[in-house]
Amino acid sequence: MKSLSIKDIAVKAGVSITTVSFIINGKARDKSISEAVIKKVEKIIVESGYKPNQIARSLRTGNSNIIGLIVEDISNSFFSKIARLIEDKAYKKGYKIIYSSTENHIEKAKELITMFKSRKVDGYIISPIKGLEEDIQQLMADNKPVILFDRNLPDLDANYVGADHFKATYHSIESFIKQGKKKISLVTIDIDVQQITERLTAYKKALADYDIPYEENLVLKVHFNQDEKETMVQMEKLFQTEEIDAVLFATNYLAISGLKVLKQTGKKIGNDFSVIAYDDHEVFELHTPGISAVQQPLEEIAETVIQLILSQLSSKTKLDNQHIILPAKLIER
């Protein structure tokens, strides 16, 4: 059966097209339309299967009820989990999420922002990369709510939600030191983004505070997006040539690759060799022995991001930007 048009619904309900439009766009109570009429029209809408054209609706109301989510890599477990949480929370508030990955390519990131603009999204949730400052500044100048998360852009005054990467990393290295470890390695990636640089800074600070010399040869910086086999070759060389007694992997996918290398080389995790992964993963709990991991507060990050962007969307005046840092915790296994 062909679904009804907005005109058909108005005729069937015995009301004007304008009244039906107000009800569909959530403005019925602002226009003092009675509850009886609202329920009558809503019943006809449900029974007819009527679905408003989203683009036409956004042109009429100025709102699309769509939020754009831009992340580094949606296949990464951290981003996929947080995207799902954001999507669920947004849906409960009447918003849909469309998302895509930058893969840390600045041109792709700029193209995504342009694409989301053409989709008339109401706001943006972005895990940014350097070089996007002007684009994000322009979004805010256009009165579009923008929430940055996971990594910040220090030169940009914008809303930001993230975990305390420095403190979580410091505590991880400190836990190694308290176990008597002296040759502590950091396996990280070579991209200049806030959360990665903070982990390296915290690593160096913890060593210095406990009078352990920083040795550059104990830090492996893996190229972002390089083939896993090449990464594993680099890790194997590091583990075999240095007398390492502990290693912090700066991401969970690096840790998973590292566990494969340790298995291949026969290096045992235990009293003589300890491992911590940044960002927890199901693999670490299932592994024998269990792998300690830094757990970011994904639920709190998602909830805070949604609360911030919804408050921005509903406010008739510009709100002050907020920087919210949430604690991460070390899960010892």
Describe each model-derived feature in a short phrase:
Residues 1-62:
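N-terminal helix-turn-helix DNA-binding module of bacterial transcription factors
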Residues 88-133:
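Central regulatory/effector-binding core of bacterial HTH transcription factors
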Residues 183, 214-218, 268-275:
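Short acidic capping loops at alpha-helix termini that bridge into adjacent secondary structure
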Residues 126-171, 178, 191, 253, ...:
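Flexible loop/hinge segments that line or gate small-molecule binding clefts
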Residues 232-333:
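Flexible loop/turn connectors
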Residues 71-80, 100-108, 161-171, 187-234, ...:
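Hinge/beta->alpha junction and helix N-cap segments in small-molecule ligand-binding domains
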Residues 17-22, 59-73, 183-190:
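Short beta-strand segments enriched in small/hydrophobic residues
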Residues 2-5, 45-78, 82-84, 93, ...:
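N-terminal helix-turn-helix/winged-helix DNA-binding helices
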